[in-house]
């Protein structure tokens, strides 16, 4: 796992308030990943990686791999 992936998992654990968040996490398998926490996740990612996300990009962040792919395309 690279440093960016580790940082994203750390942010997800904080935002969702769940310690056992793994690379398999998605909106479908994480009860805590609701609409408010989705926006909080986007905000934390913007701050951590010093970038600005478009609404379409935020909407597409439905699981760990999509978050990583989106970040890789922006960095």
Listing of model-derived features with the role each one plays in the protein:
Residues 1-21, 71-74:
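Thiotemplate assembly-line natural product biosynthesis machinery
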Residues 37:
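Two-component histidine kinase catalytic core, primarily the HATPase_c
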Residues 63-71:
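Short, cationic-aromatic polyanion-contact patches
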Residues 14-32, 48-60:
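Phosphopantetheine carrier-protein modules
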């Amino acid at each position: 796992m690279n440093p960016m992936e580790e940082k994203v998992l750390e942010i997800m654990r904080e935002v969702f308030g769940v310690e056992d968040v793994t690379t398999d996490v998605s909106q479908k398998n994480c009860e805590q990943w609701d609409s408010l926490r989705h926006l909080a996740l986007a905000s934390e990612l913007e701050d951590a990686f010093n970038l600005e996300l478009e609404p379409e990009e935020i909407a597409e962040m439905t699981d760990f791999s999509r978050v990583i792919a989106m970040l890789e395309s922006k960095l």
